[in-house]
């Protein structure tokens, strides 16, 4: 069943700041997420309860976009960041959880 995507201002701002190639890669995965209702590794990973990240790699740079499920048909895209270390930064996870609480 197709899911409705909703974007927070933080997610929209992050996406518009990225190059066309990064935007294209994210929107391809977001379309698949909307159409299928879920993404699996390596395209996405569960970070915390009801918090997932979409993973994109373009020209050796890694980008992440957090999302969550709010109801049966809704997916909220919360925030994004450029990944610079092996581990997802705790401050980015806390930020996404804080944003998620605002849309729940």
Segments (PLM) and residue ranges:
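Hydrophobic/aromatic beta-strand elements that line small-molecule binding cavities or substrate pockets
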Residues: 65-66
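Basic, Lys/Arg-enriched alpha-helical interface segments
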Residues: 1-62, 71-75, 82-104
């Amino acid at each position: 069943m197709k899911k409705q995507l909703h974007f927070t201002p933080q997610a929209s701002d992050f996406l518009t700041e990225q190059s066309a190639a990064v935007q294209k890669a994210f929107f391809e995965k977001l379309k698949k997420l909307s159409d299928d209702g879920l993404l699996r590794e390596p395209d996405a990973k569960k970070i915390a309860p009801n918090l997932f990240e979409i993973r994109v790699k373009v020209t050796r740079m890694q980008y992440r976009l957090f999302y969550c499920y709010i109801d049966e048909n809704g997916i909220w895209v919360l925030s994004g960041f450029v990944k610079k270390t092996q581990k997802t930064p705790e401050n980015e996870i806390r930020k996404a959880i804080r944003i998620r609480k605002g849309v729940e």
